[in-house]
Amino acid sequence: MNNKKVQLIVMNAMIGAAYAVLTILISPIAYGAVQMRLTEIIVLLACYNKKFIPGLTIGCLLANLASPMGLYDICFGTAATLIACLGMYYVKNVFAGALIGGVVNGLIVGLELYLALELPFMINAFYVFIGECIVLIIGAFLFKCLEKNKTLMDKYILE
């Protein structure tokens, strides 16, 4: 295995671990109908490079193992993250990516809450959408600041 492949595996492992651990640490606000999963900020990495998508998806899967929603969140939540990341990679713009993340998570997690807890779909999809958009728009501004650091972008993110 060459050095670049090892670096990619390690980078994805670190991203996945960070996402999972930090989400579990903020679990009171990271799960449920009204959620502010602050770790979602890092899914915006997918706007810059598809190489981060496996780590982000696995991190979400690991975090959802601790979810009170159980198997529903493991399946639906992880699928939402994967679909959102793919959409973000396609648009390559952090602000459009924030909207994509909000819509995808709102719809899929809203459906999850409807199926698992029989909560009203539309209002819960809206709550998840709003929480996700707040977090991701803050993240988009943070990433716009990071874009000014050419060394960071060229060496670690865009490479």
State the predicted function of each range.
Residues 12, 58-64, 144-148:
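Short, charged N-terminal helix-start/capping segments
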Residues 19-24, 56-63, 111:
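Membrane-embedded alpha-helical segments in integral membrane proteins
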Residues 47-49, 61-67:
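Interfacial segments of multi-pass membrane proteins
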Residues 28-33, 41, 68-159:
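Membrane-embedded alpha-helical hairpins and interfacial helices in multi-pass inner-membrane proteins
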Residues 53-63, 97-105:
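Central hydrophobic cores of alpha-helical transmembrane segments
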Residues 1-47, 51:
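Hydrophobic transmembrane alpha-helices
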